[in-house]
């Protein structure tokens, strides 16, 4: 305590601080009353302590409030991060599903196109074959008609040149004889 008093005296010097006419603070430690000094120090410690405690409590509340707010913001940020991760996973799954569907659609479309091309090709070949068959039949029919007409013309010419009444009589007699000998089946 003596060290404190000596230090206090040296700091303040021997000056007197006066607040008014009848009241004053004597800064000389040796001239002051220990009771007055203890009262002043008690007031300083009591009031200062209460002020310091209230200041520290306010600071503590501010720090705790800031900590709770920061903790809440961290929880909110973590919740938003988890939500964003979930949405990202859903988006990735959706993208993969869309990709799969597009690949399957493309393959199905390709298969359908190939099937249609094969069917069109088969139909074209069948039509081509039918056309060739029809043209062949027409050609055969035309040639047959020409051959028949030519044969008929030749037969007519031969008949005109070789048919006379005597040959005609022989042919008629032969046909009559065949007709007479004819017996219907079942008789």
UniProtKB/Swiss-Prot annotation:
Pfam families: ATP-synt_B
GO MF annotations, alphabetized: proton-transporting ATP synthase activity, rotational mechanism
CDD domains in alphabetical order: ATP-synt_Fo_b
Highest taxon in the source lineage: Eukaryota
Compartments, record wording: Plastid, Chloroplast thylakoid membrane
Protein topology in the membrane: Single-pass membrane protein
Family: Belongs to the ATPase B chain family.
More about this protein: In plastids the F-type ATPase is also known as CF(1)CF(0).
Function: F(1)F(0) ATP synthase produces ATP from ADP in the presence of a proton or sodium gradient. F-type ATPases consist of two structural domains, F(1) containing the extramembraneous catalytic core and F(0) containing the membrane proton channel, linked together by a central stalk and a peripheral stalk. During catalysis, ATP synthesis in the catalytic domain of F(1) is coupled via a rotary mechanism of the central stalk subunits to proton translocation.
Subunit structure: F-type ATPases have 2 components, F(1) - the catalytic core - and F(0) - the membrane proton channel. F(1) has five subunits: alpha(3), beta(3), gamma(1), delta(1), epsilon(1). F(0) has four main subunits: a(1), b(1), b'(1) and c(10-14). The alpha and beta chains form an alternating ring which encloses part of the gamma chain. F(1) is attached to F(0) by a central stalk formed by the gamma and epsilon chains, while a peripheral stalk is formed by the delta, b and b' chains.
Protein name: ATP synthase subunit b, chloroplastic
């Amino acid at each position: 305590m003596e060290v404190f008093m000596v230090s206090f005296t040296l700091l303040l010097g021997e000056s007197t601080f006066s607040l008014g006419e009848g009241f004053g603070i004597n800064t000389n430690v040796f001239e002051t009353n220990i009771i007055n000094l203890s009262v002043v120090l008690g007031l300083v410690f009591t009031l200062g302590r209460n002020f310091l405690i209230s200041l520290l409590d306010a600071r503590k509340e501010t720090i705790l409030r800031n900590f709770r707010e920061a903790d809440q913001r961290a929880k909110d940020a973590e919740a938003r991060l988890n939500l964003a991760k979930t949405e990202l996973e859903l988006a990735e799954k959706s993208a993969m599903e869309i990709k799969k569907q597009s690949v399957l659609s493309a393959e199905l479309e390709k298969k359908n196109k190939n099937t249609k091309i094969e069917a069109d090709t088969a139909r074209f070949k069948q039509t081509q074959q039918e056309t060739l068959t029809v043209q062949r039949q027409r050609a055969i029919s035309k040639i047959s008609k020409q051959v028949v007409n030519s044969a008929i013309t030749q037969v007519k010419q031969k008949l005109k040149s070789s048919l006379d009444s005597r040959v005609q009589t022989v042919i008629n007699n032969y046909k009559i004889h065949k007709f007479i000998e004819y017996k219907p089946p079942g008789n």
